[in-house]
Structure formats: structure tokens, C-alpha cells
């Protein structure tokens, strides 16, 4: 595997043309149709551990291509999630492995989807009556403190990177770990600027509040929160405060609402914490049997969670978060980032990606215009992505 990864890295410079976006053929001056975008799904991690046919309707998980079509979703960012256990060794190799898996997940189903790396690529896929698959790296430890690796991952298709996951890394503090840098370290600021130069979106989901505000000061391009909800409605530390939402709006960025009930409801979060405490001995026993936290461990945890369900929350709570965040940040700065296949439970009525149309329908019921709904469902993200592309060209030209 290491030899294969090394070979892939050496060939990265040749990879980009294979995945270059072809501009859609549209009438002169005609506005392109609105697209729907979900900025975070962890389906690749599921696929890596338990491969399945994405081209047929499945009963497991939250995502496959028929359900993507049924949900009216035009573009999905698959997360190249790098578990924190790789932070000290093997993070880059694992990241390359899961990115390669994402390419395979797209390339094996050409009638359904195409791989994309740009706004033009997304719109081109829609024009071809296909859907777009993109890559976002989850966990900045993936780059192993190397700007060269960051550039290599960009060439292999990554178009955003979540600066931290649940762990504080060597250059950025996480919202759910010990602070070591008082936000971003000097190298962390270099990472943000290099992401700006490349055209890779800076994702502030999971980061500590101070890290977020440091990014606001440093970034030359608008940033995203790929899967974060409102802390005013649910007090999870990885959710965004109203002040953070206002700062993000000033930056020109966009925050995507997460669908995980624990991040939507304090009642569910409290029950989840109690359940975790109750199941701690059993989970420890599973980890002792499978220290690598592989498929045996994951399946055992799934069974424990299923046997100890959390309180139910309605899918309309997702829209409550959208509504509040729009009121704080403005209509141009909110989107959706489901976290499907990365969350152990979902709201009732939002069991998988096929249920997505309920959200725009509810937004319209609450008085949102068609134009505003299109912004929330994808066009806000597309605007930010396009601006990041513009800033990158400007920075590259300036040197």
C-alpha cells in the first residue's frame, strides 16, 4: 500500500488534467440553473470499511446515487475523513487512500456522477444530467505539517479542508480538545494563506472559537463551515455562536447546517452524554478486542447505540436552525451540510438524502421565496466557491 501511495503522489501533477472541469454549454448570458449542494457526507469511510453498490437503492446508510437523485441533490462533497488516531503517524497515507477511494466511487458510476473540482465542473455535471462528486478533507493533521502535502492533496482533487477534527493538531486548536496554540499557530496562518492561494476552501467546522477568529483575520477568501449548526439553539461547542455567524457573514462566507440531532437539540445532547457514560465499559471492551477501531469495533458500537436509542427529534429542527442562522447572518450566508453517514442517528423524517426535498418545502411554507430557497440549498455555497477560485487566481497572478 505504501508503495502504491508513493506512486500516486509522484503522479499527482499529471492527475489534474484527467479531472479538469469542462465548461457547460449554455446560451450566451443565460443564467445557469440553480444547483443543490450538500457539503459534507462521510460515505467514503463507510464504503472503505464495507464496500457496497452505490448505483442501486440500498437499505443501509444514508447515501447512494439513486437516493441522491431522489433527493434532488446535484453535488456532494465526500469527506476524506482522517481519524485522529493517525495524527502522529500515517495521516497523509490514510488521506491519500480515502481520496483515491472517492475517485473510484465516482469513476465507477459514470452514468450517475462525475468527479468535479470547480464550480464549472459542478454546473457541467448538471448540464449533462449527472451529479457532481467533490472532495473535502476532514482533519488538518492529514497534511502532516507540510505545505507540499497540502498542495499535493489539492492536485489530487481536494477543494476544502477542515482545519481540525475533534483533536487539536500541531497548528490549530479544536473545539473539543485541549487548546495548545491560542487559536492558529504561525504555521497555521501559513496553511490558511496557502489554501487561499490554491483555491482550497478553508473549513472552520470543529475548530475552537479562537481558531475561528484567527481565520477571520488571516483569510483573504471567504470561508465555509461545512457542517455546523447554531449554538444559540444547541450549545455544542462545535456549533457557531451568533457573533461567529455575523463575523462569517462579514467575511463573505457560508455556514452549512449539520443534521445530527446532538448538534440540533440540547435535550438529545444531554441524553447522548448520559448514554456515553453508561456504555463506556462496553465500548472500552470493544476497543480492547479491536484496538485499531476497525469494522468489528464499529459494528459493535452501532449495535450498542441501536439498543440504547436517543430521544427523537423532528427534521423540522434543521429548518429551525437554518431560520435562526439566516436571521443572524443574512440570507446569503447559510447552506446545508448533512454529515450523513458520519452520524449515528438522524432526525425523524430525514432518514437519508432522499428526504432532502422536505427542507425547501418547509422553507417555502415559512415564507421564504424561491430565490432565497435556492440560495440556501446550494447557490450560497457556489458563490463562495467561485469567489475562492477568483481570489486564488488573483494571488497566483500577483506572484
Stretches found by the model and what they are:
Residues 193-204, 210-211, 244-250, 324:
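Substrate-binding cleft of carbohydrate-active enzyme catalytic domains
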Residues 20-182, 231, 235-399:
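N-terminal hydrophobic targeting/anchoring segments and the immediately downstream early-domain regions
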Amino acid at each position: 500500500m505504501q508503495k502504491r501511495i508513493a506512486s500516486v503522489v509522484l503522479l499527482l501533477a499529471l492527475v489534474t488534467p484527467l479531472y479538469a472541469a469542462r465548461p457547460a454549454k449554455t446560451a450566451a448570458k443565460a443564467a445557469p440553473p440553480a444547483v443543490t449542494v450538500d457539503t459534507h457526507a462521510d460515505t467514503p469511510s463507510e464504503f472503505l470499511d464495507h464496500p457496497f453498490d452505490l448505483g442501486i437503492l440500498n437499505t443501509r446508510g444514508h447515501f447512494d446515487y439513486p437516493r441522491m437523485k431522489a433527493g434532488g441533490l446535484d453535488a456532494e462533497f465526500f469527506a476524506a475523513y482522517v481519524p485522529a488516531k493517525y495524527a502522529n503517524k500515517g495521516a497523509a497515507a490514510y488521506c491519500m487512500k480515502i481520496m483515491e477511494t472517492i475517485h473510484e466511487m465516482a469513476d465507477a458510476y459514470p452514468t450517475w456522477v462525475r468527479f468535479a473540482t470547480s464550480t464549472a465542473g459542478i454546473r457541467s455535471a448538471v448540464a449533462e444530467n449527472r451529479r457532481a462528486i467533490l472532495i473535502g478533507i476532514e482533519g488538518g493533521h492529514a497534511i502532516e505539517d507540510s505545505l507540499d502535502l497540502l498542495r499535493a492533496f489539492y492536485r489530487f482533487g481536494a477543494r476544502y479542508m477542515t482545519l481540525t477534527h475533534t483533536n487539536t493538531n500541531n497548528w490549530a486548536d479544536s473545539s473539543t480538545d485541549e487548546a495548545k496554540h491560542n487559536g492558529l499557530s504561525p504555521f497555521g496562518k501559513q496553511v490558511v494563506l496557502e489554501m487561499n492561494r490554491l483555491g482550497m476552501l478553508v473549513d472552520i467546522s470543529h475548530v475552537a472559537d479562537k481558531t475561528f477568529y484567527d481565520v477571520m483575520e488571516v483569510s483573504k477568501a471567504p470561508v465555509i463551515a461545512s457542517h455546523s449548526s447554531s449554538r444559540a439553539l444547541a450549545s455544542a461547542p462545535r456549533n457557531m455562536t451568533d457573533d461567529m455567524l455575523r463575523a462569517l457573514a462579514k467575511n463573505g462566507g457560508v455556514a452549512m447546517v449539520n443534521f445530527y440531532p446532538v448538534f440540533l437539540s440540547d435535550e438529545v445532547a444531554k441524553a447522548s452524554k448520559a448514554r456515553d457514560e453508561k456504555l463506556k465499559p462496553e465500548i472500552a471492551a470493544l476497543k480492547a478486542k479491536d484496538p485499531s477501531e476497525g469494522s468489528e469495533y464499529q459494528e459493535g458500537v452501532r449495535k450498542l447505540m441501536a439498543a440504547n436509542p436517543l430521544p427523537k427529534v423532528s427534521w423540522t429542527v434543521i429548518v429551525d436552525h437554518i431560520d435562526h442562522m439566516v436571521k443572524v447572518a443574512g440570507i446569503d450566508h447559510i447552506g446545508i451540510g448533512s454529515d450523513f453517514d458520519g452520524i449515528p442517528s438522524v432526525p425523524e423524517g430525514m432518514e437519508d438524502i432522499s428526504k432532502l426535498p422536505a427542507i425547501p418545502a418547509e422553507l417555502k411554507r415559512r415564507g421564504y421565496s424561491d430565490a432565497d430557497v435556492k440560495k440556501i440549498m446550494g447557490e450560497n455555497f457556489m458563490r463562495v466557491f467561485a469567489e475562492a477560485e477568483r481570489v486564488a487566481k488573483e494571488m497566483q497572478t500577483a506572484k
